Swiss-Prot record:
Keywords: 4Fe-4S, Cytoplasm, Disulfide bond, Iron, Iron-sulfur, Metal-binding, Methyltransferase, rRNA processing, S-adenosyl-L-methionine, Transferase, tRNA processing. Its main location: cytoplasm. Gene3D superfamilies: 1.10.150.530, Aldolase class I (3.20.20.70). This is Dual-specificity RNA methyltransferase RlmN. Residues 101-349 form the Radical SAM core domain. Disulfide bonds join C108-C354. S-adenosyl-L-methionine binds at G180, E181, S212, S234, L235, H236, N311. Belongs to the radical SAM superfamily. RlmN family. It comes from Paraburkholderia xenovorans (strain LB400). Reaction proceeds by a ping-pong mechanism involving intermediate methylation of a conserved cysteine residue. GO terms for molecular function: 4 iron, 4 sulfur cluster binding; metal ion binding; rRNA (adenine(2503)-C2-)-methyltransferase activity; rRNA binding; tRNA (adenine(37)-C2)-methyltransferase activity; tRNA binding. The gene is rlmN. NCBIfam families: rRNA_mod_RlmN. One of its GO terms (biological process) is tRNA methylation.
């Protein structure tokens, strides 16, 4: 007779924990207790869960774990940005980045080891695609960062000190903008985001959790039906021929389909606009004429633009737009009444800036070298 495999409780959202407790003959309130211990009190084992019956603790010891991925490295930039390299096994690693600001703290979370989309301006895509992360590996990034940051600030709201478990929240915003395309790992990403939003876990609002996608249209519709959080779309070009080159996924879901999906999403979104991200590439997509094209393409979608100065890496063959050209491009958009920001480069001294999340990981995975070819874009069907 073989024993059942152990369950990593980090892989379970509230509904999953209720179902798991039911399988042990336990009532739903036990699931809520477990969730608080794991996500609010940072419990690493079951012995310290003092309000659980001893019999339940013994059951859990033999059947469940709270397994976090290991930390390979932890670097802090001169601007306060902090980057962790996270070991997810089999020579794969992902990166998690915390960006402190005066009124908020934003955590950039990865969803895949590598990325299959292979955008030309993104160093992560150049390492190829290895695998999807599990729900536990995704929410584990938030859990790890929140409690590491609390410890570094001397903040402890845990139960052992008489706190309510929530303490002084350090991570106030989460952006699913790290390594990978979140909508190509839908079944793991959505439960992780449910935990981010759950008041019994991290208690973030839907406006403070943003998912960034390169434009996986069927899954955008599915996300709108299941869990409409704030949405950012990696646009980067005002025409299909150029976007086909910069974002290969565009060949499957061209701009017309993408804009229609954005309109549908806005009907259920927690914000009344879509954020369009646009990487500024010298002589490629940064002319004033292209800014006007961009306005025409997005005219039916309430939006704001986030212009991102390109962070160069050797394999790209691309150059960052000059600051004065970025300013001229932005002015065209603003003159049309569209809110436009230019992203401030953060953490570039530790390779934590936008598009740089491959650095040390690329050397660890060497995926392109092992496969000898770029990963193919995953076929996606809405279910």
């Amino acid at each position: 007779m073989t024993s059942s495999p152990t369950v990593n409780l980090l892989d379970l959202d509230a509904q999953g924990l209720v179902a798991y407790c039911d399988s042990l003959g336990e009532k739903p309130f036990r699931a809520r207790q477990l969730q608080r211990w794991i996500h609010q009190y940072n419990a690493a084992d079951f012995d310290g869960m003092t309000d659980l019956a001893k019999s339940l603790r013994e059951k859990l010891k033999g059947r469940a774990t709270i397994s976090m991925p290991g930390i390979v490295s932890d670097h802090i930039s001169t601007d306060g940005t902090r980057k962790w390299l996270i070991d997810v096994g089999n020579s794969n690693a992902v990166e998690t980045v915390y960006i402190p600001e005066e009124t908020r703290g934003t955590l950039c979370v990865s969803s895949q080891a590598g990325c299959a989309v292979n955008c030309r301006f993104c160093s992560t895509g150049k390492q190829g695609f290895s695998r999807n992360l599990t729900t536990g590996e995704i929410i584990g990034q938030l859990r790890m960062a929140e409690f590491a940051l609390r410890a570094s600030r001397g903040v402890d709201g845990g139960r052992a000190t008489g706190g309510d478990g929530k303490g002084e929240r350090v991570v106030t915003n989460v952006v699913m903008m790290g390594m990978g395309e979140p909508l190509l790992n839908y079944d793991a990403v959505v439960p992780a985001m449910r935990l981010m939003l759950d008041d019994n876990a991290y208690g973030l609002s839907r406006r403070r959790v943003t998912l960034s996608t390169s434009g996986v249209v069927p899954m955008m519709d599915r996300l709108g039906a299941d869990l409409p959080v704030a949405l950012a779309v990696s646009l980067h070009a005002p025409s299909d021929p150029l976007r086909d080159m910069l974002v290969p996924l565009n060949k499957k879901y061209p701009l017309r389909e993408l804009m229609a999906a954005c309109q549908r999403y806005l009907k259920v979104a927690p914000r009344d606009f879509i954020t369009f991200e646009y990487c500024m590439l010298d002589g490629v997509n940064d002319s004033e004429a292209q800014a006007r094209e961009l306005l025409a393409v997005t005219r039916d979608v309430p939006c704001k633009f986030n212009l991102i100065p390109f962070n160069p890496f050797p394999e790209s063959g691309l150059i960052r737009s000059k600051p004065e050209q970025i300013k001229r491009f932005a002015q065209v958009l603003m003159d049309a009444g569209v809110i436009t920001t230019v992203r401030k480069t953060r953490g570039d001294d530790i390779d934590a800036a936008c598009g740089q999340l491959a650095g040390a990981v690329k050397d660890r995975t060497r995926l392109a070298e092992r496969t000898g070819k770029a990963a193919k874009i995953i076929e996606v069907r809405a279910v």
